[in-house]
């Protein structure tokens, strides 16, 4: 179908008249829809930014004021030897989010509780892991977060399916390249399998950023932006924990399999 001065001419030759006012209304509606999507995106990712800033301030203050005997304490630092324990928090948060969505009326204090629920495992991470390790994992997670959400928010509406395919293809290629590197190392097969599985889970979590951004852009009304921000924040923290688990997996397997060299 092509358009000629207010007429729409299908390929079969039939002429359909569309008044110019209706065409302008359609353009205005699309523009307003785009503005509304931007408002929702700004509210949602602005809330995520405030959550990250608040948690960073809390963790920095705690680590600065914490006694020196707390760092790498044998009873406190279970992250390196058993990193799976910190995943209880994101799983619990998902359950609580489901309960929040089904509760009537919704309570904003519950959302604040979900956010603060992530402080204890992050405190343990900051106390027990090397600072360089935590910073590098956080930078990698934020880079993946900004890349996937940026593509979803800035790409035109007509390329939604295309950008989904492109993002998933890039993540698949990245996962394949990492697995090839892992298989070429001189580690045990147990370590290779567990590490590859953890990388797969992390890649899936990163791709979820893109899907969450698409949901925020096209489906989230403004009144539910805060709930969407909490969900995106949970994905962000979960991916950070997955990256840290991969980085500490060598120590984890050495502890449980008593291997001198993986």
Curated annotation (Swiss-Prot):
The chain crosses the membrane at residues 46-66, 77-97, 108-128, 133-153, 163-183, 186-206, 226-246. It is a multi-pass membrane protein. Pfam families: Bax1-I. GO terms for cellular component: membrane. Its main location: membrane. Keywords: Membrane, Transmembrane, Transmembrane helix. It comes from the Viruses. It is found in: Membrane. Belongs to the cytomegalovirus US12 family. This is Uncharacterized protein HVLF3. The gene is US15.
